[in-house]
């Protein structure tokens, strides 16, 4: 069933800068009907209606309970959910998402979501939960892991038909309680890019997405996985107001481009006529693809400034928010997903139990997943024999020395014997300890008997539902047709109809002003686009002129001497938004074959001058080829060691990609609670299992 994106608007108080400028109030709100009134400097008013309107005196607790609480409940049930704050720089987006921890009423959406999730898991009976989190930022159109070992490493966005869009190499950390989540949030927030501008001393210079995965397994073994995206967007900026220069200006340019792409996606989704939705125009829209028109319940918190100095920015924010509420999503429960981390734990526990108790299986695990030590040894032996035959075949095809072959076979045999020894070293006590370590990662049911917590949770849910119903009822009252009402006198009916007519006239004038404003905005956008095109044209001409100067001095023996050919061979990569150019190569001096013996004299040329020129050029090339050491290398047969080294490098590359992936979820990773996305998502696509018993290495 399709449902619309829910939109709430929050207005912050005046800041010190606005007070110093003596700006006036331009925003008014009617919270009981979700109405926002924006007063233009010329006195004209514009009205917008949303799912919630929160003025200066509103609290983070009020916003969460009214709007976000039902969404988080749905995430625990297995839905995908997204909450993102949208607005200009300094409008209170980060404050709405993070809040102030020391003031209970002003805690933000993210810490409240942590409390909510762990309270819900603790009071739910007969379900085991696994909660893990990830934290990334998009800085200058580069995706980075804020919780990774190297938070400056650029990550790649990938897409799979059944999985959707994900970030390869993103670390996911298992959390058992609220303090663990807060520690991750604080660590990632400290790694995030922030900077000072004239409008905000702690301005976010990147978009950030904190994702909480909630996986639940019932006693029957079925798994549901919900995902909550908590998005804090960087704000749109005007250089004239922020005073940005240098790196700050470059950051602002990237921020504005990504927010512009987000606005284009929203407009295309609402338009209904667009056949193409431009999700790939930026990294932000690519990652939010499922949240806008996909399988996700989405909430937008539009943050605005009350100051008349920011009227244009506030109007733009309200317009985009008004469009966003017309986006239709189709959320469904994620049942038994292939990439569930809980399934990895489930299979590992079942595997350990079957090692010490043949025939035993884990909770909810299918019986066919259990296997005995003998079966494991048999599979190890089959893998060893297959690898040995492949290795021998490769060496025979390359006709390399037996010594090298024997050396590599011994290394392979040593790996096989080591894996067998690990099986023998696994005793019941050690296996039981490992099983307990894995089971300790699960949470759920700790407060199953706490009636007070359960009642509080149900009360909050009912209050949120009641608030939504009251808002809908209030809006329906305002939509009633006065002609359908029953009046006691004709004068009363005349007054009602006159009042309705005045409202319609006012609304009509508002639409006329809206059309004029839109024409003005379109004209400004057109001028902005023309200016951008003009600058890009200047940049392109500069690069072309530099290329014309450089091309004559490029060596003729390189493939890049032919620019037209390079252009034809270049391929555009849509995912990375860049050109994939051919590798640079240089042609070596080529002599005739050494064993050709007698070479026929070339046909006589009528023009001896041409032949003389050719001979001169050949002598010149031979003179320049001394550095290539042709005399020592040309007639020398290819060494066998070169073939061996090439085979080893190829074998190492293929092995690292297939048999020994670098980020396969091992026992240590599962116990430490740090797993990488590509270890789950790419494994779900591949039929090949990770290295056998890699998690059973004795410590």
Curated annotation (Swiss-Prot):
- As recorded in UniProt, coiled-coil segments are 339-523
Q: In which tissues is it expressed?
A: Expressed in an exclusive set of 26 chemosensory neurons whose dendritic endings are exposed to the external environment; six IL2 neurons of the inner labial sensilla, 8 pairs of amphid neurons in the head, and 2 pairs of phasmid neurons in the tail.
Q: Does the keyword Cytoplasm apply?
A: yes
The record's principal subcellular location, in a coarse class, is cytoplasm
Q: Which domain of life is it from?
A: Eukaryota
Per UniProt, residues of the Kinesin motor domain are: 4-327
Question: Positions of the site: Required for autoinhibition?
Answer: 444
Q: Could you tell me what this protein is called?
A: Osmotic avoidance abnormal protein 3
Q: Which organism is it from?
A: Caenorhabditis elegans
Its taxonomic placement starts with:
Eukaryota, Metazoa, Ecdysozoa, Nematoda, Chromadorea
Gene name in the database record:
osm-3
């Amino acid at each position: 069933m399709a449902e619309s994106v829910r939109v709430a608007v929050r207005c912050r108080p005046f800041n010190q800068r606005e007070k110093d400028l003596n700006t006036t109030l331009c925003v008014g709100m009617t919270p009981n009907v979700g109405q926002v009134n924006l007063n233009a400097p010329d006195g004209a008013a514009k009205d917008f209606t949303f799912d919630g309107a929160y003025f200066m005196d509103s609290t983070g607790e009020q916003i969460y309970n009214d709007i976000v609480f039902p969404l988080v409940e749905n995430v625990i049930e297995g839905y995908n959910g997204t909450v993102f704050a949208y607005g200009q720089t300094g409008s209170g987006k980060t404050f709405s998402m993070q809040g102030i921890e020391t003031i209970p009423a002003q805690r933000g959406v993210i810490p409240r979501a942590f409390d909510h999730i762990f309270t819900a898991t603790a009071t739910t009976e007969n379900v085991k939960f696994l909660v893990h989190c990830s934290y990334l930022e998009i800085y200058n159109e580069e995706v980075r892991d804020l919780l990774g070992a190297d938070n400056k490493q650029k990550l790649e966005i990938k897409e799979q038909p059944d999985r959707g869009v994900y970030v390869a190499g993103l670390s996911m950390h298992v959390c058992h309680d609220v303090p663990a989540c807060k520690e991750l949030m604080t660590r990632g927030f400290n790694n995030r890019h922030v900077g000072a501008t004239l409008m905000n001393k702690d301005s976010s210079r990147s978009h950030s997405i904190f994702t909480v995965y909630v996986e639940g397994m019932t006693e029957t073994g079925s798994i549901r996985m919900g995902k909550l995206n908590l998005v804090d967007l960087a704000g749109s900026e005007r250089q004239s107001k922020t005073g940005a220069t240098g790196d700050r200006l470059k950051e602002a340019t990237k921020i504005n481009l990504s927010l512009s792409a987000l606005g284009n996606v929203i407009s295309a989704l609402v338009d209904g006529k667009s056949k193409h939705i431009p999700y790939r125009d930026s990294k932000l829209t690519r990652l939010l693809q499922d949240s806008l028109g996909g399988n996700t319940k989405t909430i937008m918190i539009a943050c605005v400034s009350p100051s008349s100095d920011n009227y244009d920015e506030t109007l733009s924010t309200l317009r985009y928010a008004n469009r966003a509420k017309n986006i239709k999503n189709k959320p469904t429960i994620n049942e038994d997903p292939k990439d569930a981390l809980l399934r990895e734990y489930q299979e590992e526990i079942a595997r350990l139990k079957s090692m010490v108790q043949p025939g035993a299986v884990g909770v909810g695990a299918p019986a066919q997943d259990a296997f005995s030590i003998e079966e494991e040894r048999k599979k190890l032996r089959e893998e060893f024999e297959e690898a040995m035959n492949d290795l021998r075949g490769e060496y025979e095809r390359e006709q390399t020395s037996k010594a090298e072959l024997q050396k590599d076979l011994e290394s392979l045999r040593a790996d096989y014997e080591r894996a067998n020894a690990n099986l023998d070293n696994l005793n019941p006590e050690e296996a039981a300890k490992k099983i307990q370590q894995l089971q300790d990662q699960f949470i759920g049911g700790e407060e199953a008997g706490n009636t007070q917590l359960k009642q509080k949770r149900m009360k909050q849910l009912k209050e949120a539902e009641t608030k939504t119903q009251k808002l809908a009822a209030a809006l329906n009252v305002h939509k009633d047709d006065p002609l359908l009402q029953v009046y006691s006198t004709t004068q009363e009916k005349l007054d009602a109809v006159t009042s309705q007519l005045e409202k319609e006239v006012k609304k009509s004038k508002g639409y006329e002003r809206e059309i004029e404003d839109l024409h003005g905005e379109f004209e400004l956008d057109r001028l902005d686009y023309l200016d951008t095109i003009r600058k890009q044209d200047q940049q392109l001409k500069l690069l072309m002129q530099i290329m014309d100067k450089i091309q004559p001095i490029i060596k003729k023996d390189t493939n890049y001497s032919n620019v037209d050919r390079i252009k034809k061979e270049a391929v555009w990569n849509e995912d990375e938004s860049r050109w994939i150019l051919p590798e640079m190569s240089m042609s070596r001096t080529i002599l005739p074959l050494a064993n050709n013996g007698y070479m026929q004299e070339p046909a006589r040329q009528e023009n001896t001058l041409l032949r003389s020129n050719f001979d001169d050029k050949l002598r010149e090339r031979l003179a320049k080829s001394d550095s290539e050491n042709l005399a020592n290398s040309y007639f020398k047969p290819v060494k066998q060691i070169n073939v061996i080294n090439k085979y080893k490098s190829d074998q190492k590359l293929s092995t690292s990609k297939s048999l020994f992936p670098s980020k396969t979820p091992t026992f240590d990773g599962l116990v430490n609670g740090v797993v990488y996305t590509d270890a789950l998502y790419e494994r779900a696509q591949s039929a090949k299992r990770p290295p056998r018993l890699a998690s059973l290495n004795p410590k």
